[in-house]
């Protein structure tokens, strides 16, 4: 029996609560008698819905309140979508566990159109992501890309009301919320490179909390960690915040020995796109991510990102 209580800081959205409940169930599975409590809270990113994410501080807005709760000992762990987690952590906190990854692809969602390629000229497509906007405009400059904020249900409601012809969401969120029937098309990484960590759930805790770390250990997925840390290393080396047109995606070979990592940096209007890829031993995943970033920088990625930051008034956090 384990009489320990673990308090999970979580946002209140349906998807965030699903992730927290998943971690709760896993902890209860591995530790008989453990007491797990959810501590739901509202983040700044949940409140400011009338401004594009990039202009109000990127996706770090969705984790800061949860981190403060841990530092003030109001919670023991925080559960995050890895694509929302900034590459650097506050002093005293760290990424302890990365859980098994769900489908990392983006999803094309429409009530009337079957796929991205079937969109009529000038169609209105909703997304809050500059990464998605960049890649959409590169392949389909005719599309009218409009900002789309809110939780999954809010975004789907806006689509159903006719505000958009289609919207792009992370497939993982729809699958987890048992809404995969809303997905008209899974967009392959070759067509739209995902965000670093997309589809993965991470668990953050205090670095000095040995008891919590021991309890979390069975939830770790080693292969997901290799992939996600390689992707995040590329993002860190590019000094890219969560809300910039950067895509990165790692795949481990069938024999488990190598990782193939792809990355891209583009302008928001899709007129410029720099892409590259690299393969090497899984043990060198983060080094490969750094190397891939240097390759992109040597080809002008830094100039594109500087322009993106200035033109879009992006706060890099």
Swiss-Prot record:
Pathway: Porphyrin-containing compound metabolism; protoporphyrin-IX biosynthesis; coproporphyrinogen-III from 5-aminolevulinate: step 2/4. GO terms for cellular component: cytoplasm. Binds 1 dipyrromethane group covalently. Its EC number is 2.5.1.61. It comes from the Bacteria. SUPFAM superfamilies: Periplasmic binding protein-like II, Porphobilinogen deaminase (hydroxymethylbilane synthase), C-terminal domain. InterPro entries: HemC (IPR000860), Porphobilin_deaminase_cofac_BS (IPR022419), Porphobilin_deaminase_N (IPR022417), Porphobilinogen_deaminase_C (IPR022418), Porphobilinogen_deaminase_C_sf (IPR036803). GO terms for molecular function: hydroxymethylbilane synthase activity. CDD domains: PBP2_EcHMBS_like. Keywords: Porphyrin biosynthesis, Transferase. Belongs to the HMBS family. Monomer. The porphobilinogen subunits are added to the dipyrromethane group. PANTHER family: PORPHOBILINOGEN DEAMINASE. This is Porphobilinogen deaminase. It comes from Colwellia psychrerythraea (strain 34H / ATCC BAA-681). The gene is hemC.
């Amino acid at each position: 029996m384990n009489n320990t209580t673990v308090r999970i800081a979580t946002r209140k959205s349906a998807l965030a609560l699903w992730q927290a409940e998943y971690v709760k169930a896993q902890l209860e599975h591995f530790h008989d008698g453990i007491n797990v409590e959810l501590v739901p809270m509202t983040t700044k990113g949940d409140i400011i819905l009338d401004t594009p994410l990039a202009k109000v501080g990127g996706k770090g807005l969705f984790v800061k309140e949860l981190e403060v709760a841990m530092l003030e000992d109001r919670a023991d762990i925080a559960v995050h979508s890895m694509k929302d987690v900034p590459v650097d952590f506050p002093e005293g906190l760290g990424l302890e566990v990365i859980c098994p990854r769900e489908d990392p692809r983006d999803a094309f969602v429409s009530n009337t159109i079957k796929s991205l390629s079937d969109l009529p000229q000038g169609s209105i497509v909703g997304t809050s992501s500059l990464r998605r906007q960049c890649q959409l405009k590169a392949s389909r400059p005719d599309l009218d890309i409009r900002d789309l904020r809110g939780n999954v249900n809010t975004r789907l409601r806006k689509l159903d009301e006719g505000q958009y012809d289609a919207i792009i969401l992370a497939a993982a969120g729809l699958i987890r919320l048992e809404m995969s029937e809303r997905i008209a098309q899974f967009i392959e990484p070759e067509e739209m490179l995902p965000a670093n960590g997309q589809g993965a759930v991470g668990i953050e805790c205090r670095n000095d909390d040995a008891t919590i770390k021991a309890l979390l250990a069975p939830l770790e997925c080693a292969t997901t960690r290799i992939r996600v840390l390689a992707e995040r290393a590329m993002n860190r080396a590019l000094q890219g915040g969560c809300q910039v047109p950067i895509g990165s995606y790692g795949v481990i070979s069938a024999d488990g020995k190598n990782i193939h990592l792809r990355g891209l940096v583009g302008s928001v209007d899709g007129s410029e796109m720099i892409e590259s890829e690299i393969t090497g031993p899984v043990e060198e995943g983060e080094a490969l991510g750094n190397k891939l970033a240097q390759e992109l920088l040597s080809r002008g990625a830094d100039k594109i990102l500087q322009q993106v930051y200035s033109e879009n008034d992006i706060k890099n956090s």
